[in-house]
Amino acid sequence: MPQAIVALVGKPNVGKSTLFNRLSLREKSIVHDLPGITRDRKYAKANLFSDLIVVDTPGLEFAAAGSLEFNMMQQSLVAINEANIICFVVDAITGILPIDEECANLIRKHNKQSSTILVINKTEKPIILDKSYYKLGFSESICISAKHGQGIYELGDIIQNILSEDKKINVLTTTNTKCEYNQQCPELQLAIVGRPNCGKSTFINAILNEERVLTGPESGLTRNSVEVDWKYCGQLIRLVDTAGVRKKNAVTQSCELLSVNDTFKTIRFANIVIVMIDATRGLEQQDLSIISYAVNEGRGIVLVVNKCDLIKKKEEFQKELNRLVAYSVFQIKGINPIYISAKEKFNLESVLQKCVLTYASWQKRVTTGTLNQWLAKAMSNRPLPFQSHGKRVKIKYCTQTKARPPTIKLFCNNIESIDESYKRYLINNFKLNFDIAAGVPVRLSFVKGKNPYR
């Protein structure tokens, strides 16, 4: 189905992200009083209107080439160039400033074909529009309050009228191998998480083969989670770049706290999580905390070590890190890191293959009959312990209650007598027997009772 793109454009802190959240009916963009929170393009289906994609953009700031502000503006220019309709957002409280006039000229220069709507935000109270608004030269204008939802439906009417009147409008189609937003949510939700500056955004750009998200030597460049739909070997994937996660006591600014919370929210909604480790810093406690959180949420884990091009004694380094992972990552025994260089595009294919395989394991189901045959063999190879009164503990029956991740319910006569080591044995044996990827957590639920089918 064809989908038109509406780009929200303007100087920093005029309320573009608030309007984006309002139009998409989801809090996908972080909103903060501090200017420059949005640094990458964010796409979402506008749930208020059918067949419409809305794009949040970084604030337009005119700066020297190579600066962060300049690179952010390049992100906005991509959105301006591809948009069918541009909502040029200005601030009614500050009024029209010289930078607004520069932004208007920039829009006209880079997109002469699309219609532009002047959206005057923060008009909670009625205002009188002076000539400075009209001097911007846009025929369509509307006063709204994105924060309070005033004028949103009226804005929607203007957008729909433009789309219906302009028969020549070229709209986005979702038949491309890689598109920025797909109306149908892809099967595999793949989150890339890790400490700041470990190369998450560089990894995204490397596999997409384009500068989709901002990168640089500065720590903490990514603030919002950024979603990109993509296809790999026939598998639809939603890649999600996230803000780096530092230790709690190191997070002092409220905007960083919002970014970290957004990252943890992304983990909760992901299927598979790539936990990226900086090879120059090695495995740290914060990496283990991220892994532990993702495992507790039931996400599949793919462990990736980036920046391996900066390591001189690679064999010694990998041997030592493998040892540390085997010792420290006890929740998912047997997981092996994948060593890459996102900057040099080295070994990226191995990561993608592992993600697809882990996803298949994560949603695997085993029939009840096959499962009980496995259980009988596992208990035969390693019998259960005796109870205090000399009677052996018995697991009488098991069934898989859910996948994503695999969850097994086992009925036994004495739950307390089954220790943690035997539970780990069952999990490891199950994964080995049914070819479950090492990064997939398997959950066991023990219930005291008889076989419910006898």
Curated annotation (Swiss-Prot):
PROSITE patterns in UniProt: G_ENGA
* A GO term for molecular function: GTP binding
Query: What keywords are annotated for this sequence in UniProt?
Result: GTP-binding, Nucleotide-binding, Repeat, Ribosome biogenesis
Q: Which domain of life is it from?
A: Bacteria
* SUPFAM superfamilies xref list: P-loop containing nucleoside triphosphate hydrolases
Q: Which family does it belong to?
A: Belongs to the TRAFAC class TrmE-Era-EngA-EngB-Septin-like GTPase superfamily. EngA (Der) GTPase family.
Q: Name one GO biological process term.
A: ribosome biogenesis
According to UniProt, the name of this protein is GTPase Der
What the entry lists under InterPro entries is as follows: G_ENGA, GTP-bd, GTPase_Der, KH_dom-like, KH_dom-like_a/b, P-loop_NTPase, Small_GTP-bd
On subunit structure and binding partners, the annotation says:
Associates with the 50S ribosomal subunit.
TM segment ranges: none
Record-annotated residues binding GTP 2? 194-201, 241-245, 306-309
Q: Name one Pfam family in it.
A: MMR_HSR1
Q: What is the lineage of its organism?
A: Bacteria, Pseudomonadati, Pseudomonadota, Alphaproteobacteria, Rickettsiales
The KH-like domain, residue ranges: 364-450
Tell me the ranges covered by the EngA-type G domain, including all copies: 4-167, 188-363
Q: Which residues bind GTP 1?
A: 10-17, 56-60, 121-124
Function noted in UniProt: GTPase that plays an essential role in the late steps of ribosome biogenesis.
